[in-house]
């Protein structure tokens, strides 16, 4: 994998992924930024949340579950020191579908956390306390 990050101005950077997609990142005003893009640590949370959600949806589809939506809420706690690394990250999957089997949703969440989500597993190995749970909403 490769990525290129180019400084634009102030605390704003543009990142271009190896697959050619771009994203603007910026810092808060109190750090010289103008809040024109996501912050790098927010990008990590977006990455881990998307990686896990991708797994959960794919596993549920392969389990023949009629999943119609998956919203992943990610909450993190950072240490109160420099560097302000993540101490804890919690992922809550709000899964919607028709007659979803809770055991299969639990299995999908567990497999993502323990076997498939590279981002989540990497952060866990680095010492971040990773937790996951889910709720199910019946689709109309």
Each PLM stretch: what is its role?
Residues 1-46, 57-140:
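Extended beta-strand/beta-hairpin segments
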């Amino acid at each position: 994998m490769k990525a290129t990050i180019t400084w634009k101005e102030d605390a704003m950077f543009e990142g271009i992924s190896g697959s050619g997609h771009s994203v603007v990142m910026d810092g808060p005003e109190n750090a010289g930024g103008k809040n024109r893009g996501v912050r790098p640590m927010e990008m990590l949370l977006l990455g881990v949340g998307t990686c896990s959600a991708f797994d959960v949806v794919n596993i549920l589809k392969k389990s023949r579950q009629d999943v119609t939506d998956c919203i992943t809420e990610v909450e993190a706690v950072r240490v109160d020191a420099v560097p302000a690394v993540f101490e804890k990250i919690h992922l809550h999957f709000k899964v919607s579908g028709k007659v979803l089997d809770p055991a299969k949703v639990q299995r999908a969440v567990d497999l993502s956390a323990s076997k498939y989500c590279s981002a989540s597993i990497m952060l866990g190995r680095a010492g971040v306390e990773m937790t996951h749970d889910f709720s199910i909403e019946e689709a109309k």
